[in-house]
């Protein structure tokens, strides 16, 4: 049976993507820094922006198709691939940030990717129908992704401790 509201997942994804973009502006301290960052196409923020635009387009296509009662699995697979690219580029943007030595550890990329996978699996589990065949796989997948993210966080913490870095300023 088809989901009652197939458009709900892409709508929630689009809203969360929009909130993330607003968070980026606040994260930079001054929203105009975003414009300055975009002046350099090779900068991390520019690379993230290109992937966000591509992801947003795929999500809008998925939303329109779902709204019309059609779901195209290929669109969701493309969206997943673009989302993985976005996660990798975001992790690399932090890893390559010369001003923050704390992000230069090997655990940075897994922290970003596994954290996003854990959140995405959780969102899928929340929005899945109880009788959906995938729903039985989502709960263990969510727990596994969260456990893997926890291991990555511990590895990141050990890297910080071993390097003598204080990351408490990153919490603000």
Model features per residue range: what roles?
Residues 2-58:
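Membrane helical hairpin/interfacial module
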């Amino acid at each position: 049976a088809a989901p009652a509201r197939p458009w709900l997942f892409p709508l929630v994804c689009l809203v969360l993507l929009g909130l993330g973009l607003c968070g980026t502006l606040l994260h930079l301290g001054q929203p105009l820094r975003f414009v300055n960052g975009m002046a350099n196409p090779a900068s991390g923020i520019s690379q993230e922006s290109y992937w966000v635009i591509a992801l947003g387009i795929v999500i809008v296509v998925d939303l329109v198709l779902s709204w019309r009662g059609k779901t195209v699995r290929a669109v969701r697979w493309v969206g997943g691939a673009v989302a993985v690219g976005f996660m990798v580029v975001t992790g690399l943007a932090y890893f390559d940030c010369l001003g923050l030595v704390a992000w230069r550890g090997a655990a940075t990329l897994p922290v970003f990717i596994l954290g996003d996978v854990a959140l995405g699996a959780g969102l899928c589990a929340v929005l899945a129908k109880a009788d959906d065949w995938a729903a039985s796989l989502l709960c263990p997948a969510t727990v596994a992704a969260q456990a893997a993210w926890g291991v990555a966080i511990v590895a990141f913490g050990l890297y910080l401790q071993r390097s003598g870095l204080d990351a408490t300023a990153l919490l603000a």
